[in-house]
A protein has these predicted regions:
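Acidic, surface-exposed loops and disordered segments
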Residues: 1-170
Length: 170
């Protein structure tokens, strides 16, 4: 699957089957995050790979909007360095790399943003010097349920040419 096909078919997945990813697959996903570009090459991220089912079950307590984490093959806790000026943008680029790489390997994901960060940091022994940006669950899913039709604004609604207000015709 090429990059544009990944981007155009990507969907948030919240229901997973019981197939397990192997270590090579998990490493490829986090390697995609590590390879993301960053301002001044700061690389303001670290990743915690969680593949023990017992830990995933416990993490559901801290994932306020992501109880589906109990179904996944593995998850990545994405840490970001708050001392880096562009840390949120840079680390989000790493997240997108991981999500698209996983999608290209038929693994679904859904960004979990509502977290009990203090509880999660304590549970995973994350130092106070790091912030948790997100938890990314990854797992295999029934491919018959996706892709669904994406509701997006038309290009004419969001594209401008050379200056704001000059619309690019579709």
């Amino acid at each position: 699957m090429d990059v544009f096909e990944c981007v155009s078919t990507l969907s948030s997945i919240r229901v997973y089957d019981d197939r397990q990813a192997d270590m090579e697959t998990m490493r490829r996903v986090i390697e995609a995050g590590r390879l993301a570009p960053s301002a001044h090459n700061d690389q303001p991220w670290e990743f915690i790979l969680i593949n023990e089912q017992e830990r995933l079950q416990q993490m559901a307590k801290y994932c306020i909007s992501g109880s589906f984490i109990i179904q996944v093959s593995f998850a990545v806790v994405v840490l970001t360095d708050p001392r880096s000026k562009w840390q949120q943008i840079d680390t989000t680029r790493a997240v997108q790399n991981m999500v698209l790489t996983a999608w290209s390997m038929k693994l679904g994901s859904c960004w979990i943003g509502r977290l009990n960060e203090d509880g999660l940091k304590k549970y995973l022994k994350i130092p106070d010097s790091w912030d948790v940006l997100t938890v990314l669950p990854f797992g295999y899913f029934n491919e018959k349920i996706v892709p669904r039709v994406k509701m997006r604004k038309s290009p004419g609604e969001v594209f401008h040419l050379n200056e704001y207000g000059t619309r690019i015709n579709e």
